[in-house]
């Protein structure tokens, strides 16, 4: 028995301009998760995926090649998820009773409808 939890993204569901490679890799994570679930079922190994939306990390700074001003603008006008929010969701998935399996969990901040739509005040 065991549990594998892969981290995907909302970008595997809703692609965004300039995110072709990122979205493709997250789609691959989703396919791997589903395939492993089938392959490992008889061994009582759970395989789950969590797909976070916008999380305030260094992701945007890396995406904009160190341009902190551009990166900070991504998160202006709304409260994105924190790494702690995602960790809480991971813990929730991992702590379910043995007979309960969460295959896929989508988590976003309240202001985010999908990868392309975020309400900013």
Describe the function of each predicted region:
Residues 22, 30:
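Catalytic tyrosine of NAD(P)H-dependent dehydrogenase/reductases that use a Tyr as the general acid/base
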Residues 9:
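Residue(s) in the substrate-gating loop at a strand-loop-helix junction
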Residues 14-20:
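Active-site loop immediately N-terminal to the catalytic Tyr-X3-Lys motif
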């Amino acid at each position: 028995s065991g549990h594998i939890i892969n981290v995907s993204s909302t970008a595997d569901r809703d692609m965004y301009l300039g995110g072709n490679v990122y979205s493709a890799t997250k789609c691959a994570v989703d396919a791997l998760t589903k395939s492993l679930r089938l392959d490992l079922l008889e061994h009582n190994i759970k395989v789950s995926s969590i797909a976070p939306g916008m999380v305030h990390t260094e992701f945007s700074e890396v995406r904009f090649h160190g341009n902190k001003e551009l990166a900070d603008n991504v998160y202006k006008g709304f409260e994105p998820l924190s790494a702690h929010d995602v960790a809480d969701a991971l813990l929730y998935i991992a702590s379910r009773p043995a007979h309960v399996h969460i295959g896929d969990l989508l988590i976003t901040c309240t202001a985010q409808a999908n990868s392309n739509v975020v309400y900013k005040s």
